[in-house]
Amino acid sequence: MLAWLHASKGQGTEPFGPLGAEPPQQSIGMNDASASQQIDAILRKTTGWRGERLGQLRALIRGADPGVIEEVKWKKPSRPEGVPVWSRDGIVCVGEVLKNAVRLTFPKGAQLKDPKGLFNTRLDSKTVRAIDFHEGEAINAAALKALIVQGARLNRS
């Protein structure tokens, strides 16, 4: 529960998640595993192209900045395994498996320069930007790594 109430370093004390939302219930069984092991389990559970894509994105994120750490947040009954999160002095990006896409959400994405136009959703938000990856689409690894590095730098500034 403390993870829900604890804000990222250098940020306020507002909880993560929807405003006014109650802290999600913790999943029994995965709490003892490290975040990396929990993400491994999420990848094993996510079959087909979406699991493969999330694994590819994870590798790119980890390779972009060795200081980025893995976390799992927002466990709740409808998603007991939680959501993969990559942080460095605050959240850099969040990975979500959707019905027809794998989404990387950047909580401070509106502040990032995106010269290659990777952001393709949440474009109306004043703070958040996201990228939906669909089956068969290529990943622009260099541009994605640049966004990861920018996001981590922004958190440290």
Predicted regions and their residues:
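Extreme N-terminal basic, low-complexity initiation segments
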Residues: 2-12
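Charge-dense, helix-prone N-terminal extensions
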Residues: 5-6, 16-157
